[in-house]
Amino acid sequence: MPSSSDTALGGGGGLSWAEKKLEERRKRRRFLSPQQPPLLLPLLQPQLLQPPPPPPPLLFLAAPGAAAAAAAAAAASSSCFSPGPPLEVKRLARGKRRPGGRQKRRRGPRAGQEAEKRRVFSLPQPQQDGGGGASSGGGVTPLVEYEDVSSQSEQGLLLGGASAATAATAAGGTGGNGGSPASSSGTQRRAEGSERRPRRDRRSSSGRSKERHREHRRRDGTRSGSEASKARSRHGHSGEERAEAAKSGSSSSSGGRRKSASATSSSSSSRKDRDLKAHRSRTKSSKEPPSAYKEPPKAYREDKSEPKAYRRRQRSLSPLGGRDESPVSHRASQSLRSRKSPSPAGGGSSPYSRRLPRSPSPYSRRRSPSYSRHSSYERGGDVSPSPYSSSSWRRSRSPYSPVLRRSAKSRSRSPYSSRHSRSRSRHRLSRSRSRHSSISPSTLTLKSSLAAELNKNKKARAAEAARAAEAAKAAEAAKAAEAAAKAAKASNASTPTKGNTETGASVSQTNHVKEVKKLKTEHAPSPSSGGTVKSDKAKTKPPLQVTKVDNNLTVEKATKKTVVGKESKPAATKEEPVSTKEKSKPLTPSTGAKEKEQHVALVTSTLPPLPLPPMLPEDKDADSLRGNISVKAVKKEVEKKLRCLLADLPLPPELPGGDDLSKSPEEKKTAAQLHSKRRPKICGPRYGEIKEKDIDWGKRCVDKFDIIGIIGEGTYGQVYKARDKDTGEMVALKKVRLDNEKEGFPITAIREIKILRQLTHQSIINMKEIVTDKEDALDFKKDKGAFYLVFEYMDHDLMGLLESGLVHFNENHIKSFMRQLMEGLDYCHKKNFLHRDIKCSNILLNNRGQIKLADFGLARLYSSEESRPYTNKVITLWYRPPELLLGEERYTPAIDVWSCGCILGELFTKKPIFQANQELAQLELISRICGSPCPAVWPDVIKLPYFNTMKPKKQYRRKLREEFVFIPAAALDLFDYMLALDPSKRCTAEQALQCEFLRDVEPSKMPPPDLPLWQDCHELWSKKRRRQKQMGMTDDLSTIKAPRKDLSLGLDDSRTNTPQGVLPPAQLKSQSNSNVAPVITGPGQPLNHSELAILLNLLQSKSSVNMADFVQVLNIKVNSETQQQLNKINLPAGILATGEKQTDPSTPQQESSKSLGGVQPSQTIQPKVETDAAQAAVQSAFAVLLTQLIKAQQSKQKDAMLEERENGSGHEAPLQLRPPLEPSTPGSGQDDLIQHQDRRILELTPEPDRPRILPPDQRPPEPPEPPPVTEEDLDYRTENQHVPTTSSSLTDPHAGVKAALLQLLAQHQPQDDPKREGGIDYPTGDTYVPSSDYKDNFGSSFSAAPYVSSDGLGSSSAAAPLEARSFIGNSDIQSLDNYSTASSHTGGPPQTSAFTESFASSVAGYGDIYLNAGPMLFSGDKDHRFEYSHGPITVLTNSNDPSTGPESTHPLPAKMHNYNYGGNLQENPGGPSLMHGQTWTSPAQGPGYSQGYRGHISTSAGRGRGRGLPY
């Protein structure tokens, strides 16, 4: 080491390392004295005047840093690059290293002269700036180049204390640019190369660093020798000082200032030489080092006072460049020697090293013993020959320096760049190598043009450096010795780069004032060396970059003198132990440097539009530059501070963002998993923290769970119940399939993950983790695996419990549920999240009575300050508030409160309160209960888009309190408040918690309801239950999931009990003739007594009956299509025998149900299910016939029925008020219902035809289809009471005959009933008889059947029964209503008829519209919870039936049987709307259903008008 350093120094000055250090110290002292600057100025000025064009760019950089440094850099680089600073800068940047060596040699004489000239030229301004404008001049300069920083810092010292900091900064920045932008950039790049090399030196070994230092010394000897001599002569320093500068320049690889001065020229050239002739220049530089070292000593001598000031500067800069300044100046000189042999540039560096020696140990070490060591240190700090400030900046700028590397890549100022710079600064030698690799096209360009010029300059500089070196050898030897001692102290203080840097920073801070003075004194010499270094760095980085660096460095030096000095002082204290910290701190400076480098790199790319050249004059005008620099420097200082903080951050750049992101979204998990699998080290750490924190997100496989079964289906996958194999804990796995995701991970899943990870509340579902179904990320990617969101398991959801009929919630339970629900919602809203999908199936309940809000797939962040549109197609229709229905897009959290209000009503009524299948129908239902939206109650409603297009048919007054009188007063107040039409008047979740109903509720202290512990009641289970009942309790459909909507449409297969209930619409249509017939027949509305008699005679008389004959006997008008279908159907004798009675009763039932428009297929279906397919065919035929018969009857009976309904609706409505779930036994319930209902209805409807209302336990789950929506149902309980089905029976002219027939049928059906019960679980006769009362209770709730409307049939079905009533004959409608009720809930037929007059037709029409094939609704769609109370279900006739008119709604009982369309339709409107159903009466709407009508199919939707809703 010493020998190498000696060689470097000795090469320059023939002095021992200690002597050189002494010389450098002496020089620094001299620099400290203000006398030298005047000398330098006269010398530099004339020469600078010669290369003024090139100097301006350098000056621009130099002036901010230090005018003298800029001048030196300008002189050094301008002599070479004067013609084209920008281009040269690019070239230099490209050819940082090799040109460095070459340029150093070339610079030797010529470069030295030019450097001196530039120094002279720049010195005056540095002095001008330096005297008072050091901040501007000095500030700009240091930013530019690390190598130049030493010389520039010297210049800055010459400039003055303030300018010293600035000059130190500018020295790095401007010094490098001093010769020209190109030269400065080249110098910067060289400095970067040197910096990088020092890093590599660190990485490699002290040997490498020694070699590189030697090379740097050699190169710097040549380069900085000439440059330093030139710079000194330019600066007006004595020949000895010049010689010393040259020596120190050669030793400036260890010493910072000469590096910057001579390094400006020689470092730029040396960098090019390094890049181009790295090895050659090494050998050559090994030869040259003596002169270079000799010259650097002069530079050091000249810079000696500068080095001190520079050290101060560098120290002050050390936080940014300061660390590197002290270490870098020393290290830079060493690194330059070792790397570039930018030691010539390091000639200035040697003074820096001397100054740095003030962070002395590092500097002296680096210089004398550890050129290699220092190169390692230089890796951290002295990458550039110039002092740390310039070298560090360059370093950071240089691709090899932390900043440089970064700059080579991105040159971002981010802490990440500083992080990168850390690693690079760690290995400066490697940096220098990487520097070569990092040579960018711009660098190459600099190499080509700038390298040549630099080589020429190097020669001139070498000559000058040789001259100056000889003269300055003596002085520089002393200065070098001093600098070496100081550097050794600094390096010792900060053995690691960081330590050196920090020590240097602290020392530089302390010495910065001195350095500023020295820079003022030494400003002239330092610019020459600084110019060399800067020119190298200028090569490395364009002048613009240099200018930015200078600006940043100036301010940063000033600010960071304090900051970095502070940091460096503690660092110096901790230096060796803190080497890691030092690394981070150097990284911080390098980070600042990187950012500067990045700017410089950007500038390099932007060299053509070099703003710096124009600014070079500004640099000459140090004040303007200073202002710019100060601003930039302040920014960079701030950035540096931030960078320091960032550098201190433990996480890699990706972690902060990736951590949360990867953690929260499964996507990121997937990425993390994939990455971790692919790159476990990278991904593991990146996402590992997250995964570890979040239970190894994505690392766990779904195999960790035992999947027990499917419990639900979401928008993007199934939900499974599973057990954790490790803990035994029950969990819910929500599957997220990526198979069909063209856009990648489903946005709903992303939203849910992101939001749920931000929500932690006892009333909000907890997402535990995310797992995949692939253990290997590659397999996952190949096979498009699935993600599983792991949630805590909840035993039930509210919908499943309400539909199951297994649970009764009392007021306390409802209070507890609502309290928990509103607490969770209030938490969401306070977190500014809108749930936007609150419904019963998304409210989960465990066996402990805890409520949790789930399914945040539609949730989104809500900004109350920002009014921006959101989609209004959110929230399930039944729970959608009126503002969304009217097109509001700037909604508020009030939308969720409305949904909760609907749930509150549903908890009391056991059914959805607003069940429509279309938005217009939903708004109509809301208007009937809550009043029509109007400006009087809702002033802003007129602003809504659909206010004029979605107006209800009529204006309704608000009668919510009247409709829900049965609700406790406190609950009713809250209910009324939550269902305010005007969202601004609606209560908030927080206000709801303060209301009387919920104020004092403590759910934890309230006993949970008696929940079915043996059965988990989920929506999917409930739907399956409905289907099973529809399928005749077969398990075939158990696996099939029917959406709640479909169920509500009339998928209530529990009534149909025929597997056909599940058939697709097309099949259902075709089969309705044969297979569906039994269903239709079962629930078929009662025919006229004469018709029934005829049918009975026909069926009994013939062993087999052709349906065509059957139609003829019944005098039914059939269209040709239906006739053909009937011809194909023959009723087997067996069917007649077994199903004869069933058919007969079913026929009357069909007739009544058809007239009612309700669907009562379940009764017939039950018997038929047991019977053969032939029976089904017979029933389908009967359904068709009966539909047509009923159509005719309905037209006649409509009026009578309407009248009777009006008459009878009065008494039956109260009966219907009965609690819906109560019918425990079909018999008893029937009796009660019969008593409540007119016994006429019972008489009218044969007992066999009447479905029994089974106890909730025995009843099949309510089909999704709500019971026929009767007016009772719509009216909820009140109106249900008002709409008795008996009136329709009274109206029926053939009421007596029908009653007799019904009795006969009932007698026959009792036998069939068991079959029906088997299929439907409802004894038709018994259940049906009580249907009137149940209809009040269940009918109302069921007819409102929430699920029907979800399909869209619900509301229409409700309307349909009303219309059907009016449309269909009263008696028919009554029976239909009764029967439909039976089918839907097996309620007494009479009740249904009461509603069905008006409603039946509407139901039929509604069903037709909803179901393309026919208006019939599926009872399976009905909610079972409502099924019990539902009265008669109106049977919708097949829309297919051409003859199907409004009256024909009941003619297709078969189809209706399958799906209980009537019942579903009635329920769909919702209880309240059905209650209003009387108003809905539009008899014309109820169309007859053709045989082909399929209840399952939403044929009603196809019908278009058959909704049965008045609107």
From Swiss-Prot:
Please describe the quaternary structure of this protein: Interacts with C1QBP. Interacts with CCNK, CCNL1 and CCNL2.
From the UniProt entry, list the residue stretches annotated as the region Disordered: 1-20, 30-59, 74-599, 653-678, 1048-1074, 1138-1168, 1197-1272, 1465-1511
EC annotation from Swiss-Prot or TrEMBL: 2.7.11.22, 2.7.11.23
According to the UniProt entry, which residue ranges have a biased composition of type Polar residues? 491-511, 1144-1166
PTM Phosphothreonine: at which residues? T588, T871, T1058, T1245
What's the encoding gene here? Cdk13
Q: Where is the composition biased (Gly residues)?
A: 129-140
- Briefly, what is this protein's role? Cyclin-dependent kinase which displays CTD kinase activity and is required for RNA splicing. Has CTD kinase activity by hyperphosphorylating the C-terminal heptapeptide repeat domain (CTD) of the largest RNA polymerase II subunit RPB1, thereby acting as a key regulator of transcription elongation. Required for RNA splicing, probably by phosphorylating SRSF1/SF2. Required during hematopoiesis.
Q: What class of enzyme is it?
A: transferase
Biased-composition ranges for Pro residues? 49-58, 1253-1269
Q: Where is the composition biased (Low complexity)?
A: 160-171, 246-269, 384-402, 463-490
> Which superkingdom does the taxonomy of this entry point to?
Eukaryota
Q: Where is the Protein kinase domain?
A: 705-998
Q: Where in the cell is it found?
A: Nucleus speckle
Q: Which reaction does it catalyse?
A: [DNA-directed RNA polymerase] + ATP = phospho-[DNA-directed RNA polymerase] + ADP + H(+); L-seryl-[protein] + ATP = O-phospho-L-seryl-[protein] + ADP + H(+); L-threonyl-[protein] + ATP = O-phospho-L-threonyl-[protein] + ADP + H(+)
Identification of the protein by name: Cyclin-dependent kinase 13
* Basic and acidic residues compositional bias, start-end: 189-198, 295-309, 512-523, 564-585, 660-670, 1197-1209, 1233-1252
Checking CDD domains in the record gives: STKc_CDK12 (cd07864)
Name positions with the PTM Phosphoserine: 316, 318, 326, 341, 343, 359, 361, 384, 396, 398, 401, 438, 440, 526, 1048
Give GO MF terms, alphabetically: ATP binding; cyclin binding; cyclin-dependent protein serine/threonine kinase activity; protein kinase binding; protein serine kinase activity; RNA polymerase II CTD heptapeptide repeat kinase activity
Q: Where is the active site?
A: D837
Chain positions found as N6-acetyllysine: K557
